[in-house]
């Protein structure tokens, strides 16, 4: 399936607050993510707690061991909601 991508304002604010090394890791992961958000290298997984809270399926991908990007898919649009540590899951 061909996706369009729409980062939210919150995603960009969190991205700009990352260290330069984390930004580099995110850029590398983004190249993979744009090809396939569910590529095995990104370890995409459903976040049950957030999915239940927002009434839609919410996913996260692993960028670094303690850095995740959270997103959902609406029709063919991948909306990247936020990026950060496990605290995003709360």
Provide a role label for each language-model segment.
Residues 11-42:
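N-terminal first-folded block
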Residues 4-5, 40:
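Residues that recognize and position ribonucleotide moieties
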Residues 32-61:
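A short, surface-exposed loop/turn module that caps and links secondary-structure elements
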Residues 2-4, 10-20, 54-56, 60-90:
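Enriched for short, Lys/Arg-rich terminal
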């Amino acid at each position: 399936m061909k996706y369009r991508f729409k980062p939210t304002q919150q995603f960009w604010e969190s991205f700009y607050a990352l260290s330069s090394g984390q930004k580099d890791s995110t850029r590398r992961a983004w190249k993979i993510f744009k090809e396939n958000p569910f590529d095995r290298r990104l370890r995409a997984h459903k976040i049950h707690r957030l999915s239940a809270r927002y009434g839609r399926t919410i996913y996260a991908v692993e960028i670094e061991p303690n850095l995740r990007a959270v997103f959902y898919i609406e029709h063919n649009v991948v909306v990247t909601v936020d990026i950060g540590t496990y605290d995003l899951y709360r």
